[in-house]
Amino acid sequence: MTKNGDIVEKRAYPSPNPAIRLTEITYMSQGLRIKGLLAEPKTEGTYDGFLYLRGGMQSIGMVRPSRIAQFAAQGFIVFAPYYRGNRGGEGKDEFAGADRYDAVFAVDVLKQFCNDNIHVFGFSRGGIMALWTAILRRDITSVVTWAGVSDATATYWERTDMRRMMKRVIGGTPNRVPEAYDARTPLFEVEHITAPVLIIHGYQDENVDIEHARQLAFFLDDANKTYETWYDLHYAHQYPPAKNRETVRALCEWMKQH
């Protein structure tokens, strides 16, 4: 009998970095077989765990091997779940509905490879997944949300290009089913977060408005939680390559200090 977080299949995956080993893993989440990508430094050692929670929906924003290898090269064992219904995984992606448990149980996958420190990172839609993971677990060391979504209702109104998909997945508009949007919004549950949170966001972001970051900071502050903000006046959703690399290094250092 398999349980949540059990690994049921592994296969070697081509790596863009000769110093990093990639493995595609199939694991169990609520009775579904979910897939994800594991990145491990080949140099022997004990490493912290890094849960990489991707942005996007279905094929948009899919996990990029080069990106998770980049984080692994900073000295982490990285696991990036694809979420249910993606790349051969069972079930349906629900935009932070029951699929939040694919992130929650991915921590149990990661623990089979790393030491006791588990850092959770979410980019864009991954931000909402990262916050839910930190709300639903007590064993998270730190959380970083970069250009992260924190409010499902705001995303619906901001992203006209995502409305059809969100209506289909969530079951209607925020006006028709406000409770379904509230149930996906982690802001109302941040008092359960036990890990420090780093919020990274660019003021010029047109995909995820800076207000997602400011609201998250407000709610964390109100709940007396430990958090830090790295806002940038000039950058949008995707930082330029040099700034991106610099931010990756800086956030990884921040994680290691917690």
Stretches found by the model and what they are:
Residues 2-43:
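N-terminal cap/lid segment of alpha/beta-hydrolase-fold proteins
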Residues 45-47, 52-91, 153:
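Short substrate-entry loop that stabilizes the transition state in hydrolases
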Residues 94-113:
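Alpha/beta-hydrolase active-site loop
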Residues 114-124:
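Alpha/beta-hydrolase fold nucleophile elbow
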Residues 127-138:
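Short glycine-enriched nucleophile-adjacent loop
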Residues 153-189, 195:
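Mobile cap/lid helix-loop segments that gate and shape the active-site cleft of serine hydrolases
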Residues 193, 199-201, 205:
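Short beta-strand/loop motif that positions the catalytic acidic residue
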Residues 214, 223-258:
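C-terminal catalytic histidine-bearing segment of alpha/beta-hydrolase fold enzymes
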